[in-house]
């Protein structure tokens, strides 16, 4: 149970006062004893009184001192030990070898302390210096030191090259049932060099593990065995050592259920810490500071410095917080650096919600975090999931190297220590929520390349793809090649061996050398490097950032080798990291930084230093598959932009060439420019062909087809000559002239946007027919059309024959009756339309039976159709019938202004299919359609109310009108007729049903329904009279039976027959 204990600073004051008072008391007692032995007896009461006076004199000082208490986890280690120390001081004040200082009593001095942070000198007595007289306790601005260090920080081996073994890429892990979270977390942890090196170093514990469980061994042993399996197996393995201990890791995790990878990571690290603490006998009595010195905490653990500043009195309260991962909010960030800026920025606390220690009241304050001690391996979790399970799927861009120096605390030791980290592994989540999806991992190998681990699948991945990954958990390890051997809060990152740091300079070695940013070859060319090592040692490398001349040391894997211990290389920031920080593209490398992965099998590749590999990447940027694909896409886009200079709308589809045998000459000007030029040369004609026989005989080329054809060959055809009609050249170079073809070409300017939509289907349909009809056409005309026939095209060709609609679209005007024909290339329903298309687009001058008859048919040949296809006039397209005002209009080749204007109208005879710029129906059009649908439904439901609102109206007699269908819902005359036949048969045949019963039924029916269906028409309405007449007719048996006599007449007839 937690107990309260006096703070060290106050306890020191109390101990000093007690020593001083007891020292005076002992001195007086010694004087009294000397009196007794030398000069006779004395009064014992006088000596006791003297001691009481002396104690009471110092009691005021003790009582006036301020005593502060803090919460401690254990009573025995805190209170009883302090009491024992006090008793020892009373009995043996001069000869005491035990320490009288409490935990952390020597925080403020600059002397070298022991392993537990105590000052063991001066026989345990603490002498106050002049500088410590005002500050006798520990400084609140410094991180407290633990009594005992379980695992020194210096023993952590950073980097793959610090291990004596050769690290492999690692095999995949088989998914044994929703264990992708477990596999990805283990792969990410096993590719952290510091953790992997520590697990390998636990071989002694693995052999002598005294923890006997049902599954055998502790969780650390299970992790070490799994790591060895991934390095030794040749195929995917099953992580059964970890999977079998899932309940031991976390009790609420269920086997076979999907779990969160970050939650599993936290429980796994905590289980490993507990397993390590169980090696010590009194692990339950260790304080929190000591427990934070385990290997897991030394690798992942760090300390945050929290500064809370009062806005009233500017008092600053400093606290320290231990962390193993940073949870970054990415809702307002797009990059990892922005997320770090938001995490370490100063935030304002709730107004009047903080109680200031200086003001002793609740005030407004600000809070800011900073890094007091940075971890060796930085774990970053991006907050992608909410409490309700939703996922934030935004992409956060990050770099393979980050610098956190600007977030370090403002102490001199921390400010001078550069904090450069490099990405070693990450966990990604694919899915839209935390309840579903898939986890994968990415890890960096010893060669410096990255691999993607998707359960049992392992494949290399380029650096560019790694940086574009939608990451969830990221692991960055401290980069020793970018750091200098400086102490961090008394703990050195190196092994105690000092070395001289070599500063980096940007200035060149010679006055004539200019600064060059980007890839640059070394002085010796490519031969100056051998497996990533520089051959020149005396001269500085001429790179973007050059280094001064330095003394050569035997190097292994980028770290200097001392007396059996690994040291950091004296390199400063590499050019690669500097270039990347400036925004330059990071070169994507393969397994060993080379294009071919076969070089990874060389014997000297494991001796490459990380810094030198970065130099090699900086000098020779290697292209990856992703970069090649991007280059190819860029080249394609450039070629397309060069070949197609014509600007197009976003809704215009991209056209492809109809056939491979068309000319490949580029188009020098756009189709629109050619059409404008042709319009200037063409005389104006009548807009509406009311009574012109000559214009009716002349075929008018379809402007939409001409536009679609010219668009489809935009990238492959040459400029049309003035004599060309449709802007196309023949297959063999022959040209076709049509002088009257541009009669209605001015309509294209009004329909340039809408006509482009039909070009895609037109070109696709022409592609299908080219191969089938090419041979047939070559037999007929061999690709040539004589000039005489082209002239006869405008004289003797019959007008197109549209299909017979159910109701012809006829418009009455003052000038007479005329039909409305439309140009619509997107209307085609079945295969019969193809035959009508052939009839409409004839090229051979065959006279039709009746040119004035719109329903006349003419024969056609496949060769004629092929010739029309070559000329670009007849292009088959998918057609959809458009219905306007109850009439169904079909496509025709006569293009005129009226048809184009009708198609563009929102109401009237045209369709309402107006598309937006994106090619989709407009929102306003959707609302109008929905409103019209609701209105029709409302009219259908409230037909009687609407008829009442309209009042009496004139009824139109129609021979085909069936009043009983709409006026009597639920009434079936055929059923009534059959019922009447059954009643008549039963009465005439002497059945069990008498006739009068049927008659009464009919009378009752008529009486009940007399006014039910005649509410608004009045008694003399035509509808009511028809209903009554129909009812009487059916009641009498229809047309086959006459009116039946009444019941009295039947009785009279029966009497007469009997008599």
Curated annotation (Swiss-Prot):
Q: Where is the active site?
A: 180 (nucleophile), 438 (proton acceptor)
Q: Which GO terms describe its cellular component?
A: cytosol; nucleolus
Name one molecular function that GO assigns to this entry.
cysteine-type deubiquitinase activity
Query: Where is this protein found?
Result: Nucleus, Nucleolus
Q: Which residues carry this modification: Phosphothreonine?
A: 673, 682, 804, 846, 861
Reaction catalysed by this enzyme? Thiol-dependent hydrolysis of ester, thioester, amide, peptide and isopeptide bonds formed by the C-terminal Gly of ubiquitin (a 76-residue protein attached to proteins as an intracellular targeting signal)
Domain spans labelled USP: 171-479
Give the UniProt keywords, A-Z. Answer: Hydrolase, Nucleus, Phosphoprotein, Protease, Thiol protease, Ubl conjugation pathway
The Low complexity compositionally biased stretches are 94-123, 540-560, 592-611, 633-647, 729-739, 752-765, 1048-1059
Where is the segment annotated Disordered? Answer: 24-49, 94-148, 505-673, 687-893, 926-998, 1012-1059
Q: Which domain of life is it from?
A: Eukaryota
Q: Where is the composition biased (Pro residues)?
A: 799-808
Q: Name one GO biological process term.
A: germ-line stem cell population maintenance
As recorded in UniProt, coiled-coil segments are none
Entries under CDD domains matching the protein: Peptidase_C19E
Q: Mark out the compositionally biased spans (Polar residues).
A: 130-139, 528-539, 779-795, 842-862, 876-893
Q: Where is the composition biased (Basic and acidic residues)?
A: 655-664, 926-940
Q: Where is the composition biased (Acidic residues)?
A: 766-776, 825-839
Report the principal subcellular site. Answer: nucleus
Q: What is its EC number?
A: 3.4.19.12
Q: Which residues carry this modification: Phosphoserine?
A: 508, 510, 692, 694, 766, 801, 807
Assigned protein family: Belongs to the peptidase C19 family.
Subunit-structure text:
Interacts with atms/PAF1, but not with CycT.
Cited function = Required for maintaining multiple types of adult stem cells, including male and female germline, epithelial follicle cell and intestinal stem cells. May function as a transcriptional repressor by continually deubiquiting histone H2B at the promoters of genes critical for cellular differentiation, thereby preventing histone H3 'Lys-4' trimethylation (H3K4). Controls selective autophagy activation by ubiquitinated proteins.
What is the designated name of this protein?
Ubiquitin carboxyl-terminal hydrolase 36
What organism does this protein naturally occur in?
Answer: Drosophila pseudoobscura pseudoobscura
Q: What is the lineage of its organism?
A: Eukaryota, Metazoa, Ecdysozoa, Arthropoda, Hexapoda
